[in-house]
Amino acid sequence: MDLYSIKLKVITILAGIGIALLFSLIAYGLLYYFYGLSGISIIYFLLIFVLFIDIIQWLVSPYIIGMTYRLQKVSPMSQYGYLIDIVHDAAEKNNIKEPEVYIAMRGSPNAFAYSSPLAGKRIAFTKSILDILNRDELEAVAGHELGHLKHHDVELLLAIGLIPTLIFYLGYSMIFSGFGRRNGGSFFLVAIILFILSSVFNIMILGVNRIRESYADVNSAMTIPNGAENLQNALAKIYSYSMPSKQTSNSTVNMLMFSDHIENDLGRDYRKLVEKWKNMKPPVSIFSDHPHPAKRIQILERYKNSF
């Protein structure tokens, strides 16, 4: 593991811990100020309630994703059986257990990995991505997705994703707590501040996700032969052939995608796109859940001879 990948790992861990600690201090201070010791029981109740909902969602989400994307499990004898071999080879190189492989019958070119205690670990490729990437590029994409599983990114998103929801419910409860009180206006003002803080924490989580995506790219470059160059080509092909979209979401499913499909020029030669991204200054967007492809390409460029 090189210095940059260690840096990405440490930043991800510290960011997650920092977000959790910041939330704890804000929640504890506000509840103690307005409710005294009884306010601490409120946050415990909210934490247990939201945690229960999130765990249920985590357990059943693979089945919901399966229905949404019309996922079909790949069998060795099917026309997509070669995907099992690709994922098997990539999993061996990553020293992790091979996940189940699925094909998504709908959706633009993409891939994603997800897991739960009930469904186990899974990796899915959309049918359209198979039409534009060669075998080596698919293995590089698999190396990226397996990086998410190896780094326990699903669990990380579950943990820190609770925080904006908790802050929102805390603000919601303070609105009702303020009714009929002499200082009800203060409760309402704090509730508005909490709603704003919920959005701020969402932006912070998007930042963590961008780091997480870069770390998965580095994982592919360091574990898959020629992974850096093949992942660069895969990114360029996906952005060249995907329908343009400006939609940004911080949903867990969108965060787990390999690409977020920013607006692009259809039909552009992917090699020219790679060269352009190598030399451009990547724009910064705090509202994006993926790094700009130029930033991803430039990070991968550092790792072309790292395998």
Swiss-Prot record:
It is a multi-pass membrane protein. This is Protease HtpX homolog. Belongs to the peptidase M48B family. One of its GO terms (cellular component) is plasma membrane. GO terms for biological process: proteolysis. The chain crosses the membrane at residues 10-30, 40-60, 156-176, 187-207. Zn(2+) binds at H144, H148, E213. Keywords: Cell membrane, Hydrolase, Membrane, Metal-binding, Metalloprotease, Protease, Transmembrane, Transmembrane helix, Zinc. The keyword Protease applies. Its cofactor is Zn(2+). Its main location: membrane. InterPro entries: HtpX_protease, Pept_M48_protease_HtpX, Peptidase_M48. Binds 1 zinc ion per subunit. Its EC number is 3.4.24.-.
